[in-house]
C-alpha cells in the first residue's frame, strides 16, 4: 500500500462543524494523502476513501475524483453522490 501515496491524489476533507453536526456532509480541499480503504470506481477513477481529516477515526467517507468532493457518513451515501 506504500505506492498509493505516490499515485493517489492529495485530498483532505475539511470539516464545517455546523454542517457536520447536522448532515454529515462538508466540502474538501487539497491536503495530505492517506490510504484508500473502499469504494473505488474503475471507469473514471472516482473513489470514496476513509481516513482523511477530520475522518481519521474512519467514520466518514470522502468522494475523490467524482461528481462531488464532499464528506459522507456512509459508503452508500458517498458512492451515490460520487459516482
From Swiss-Prot:
Tissues in which the UniProt entry reports expression: Expressed in endosperm, anther and pollen.
InterPro entries according to UniProt: Meg
Record keywords: Disulfide bond, Signal
Signal peptide region: 1-22
Cystine crosslinks: 60-82
This protein's record includes keyword Secreted: no
Family of the protein in this entry: Belongs to the MEG family.
Protein name listed in UniProt: Protein MATERNALLY EXPRESSED GENE 3
Organism name: Zea mays
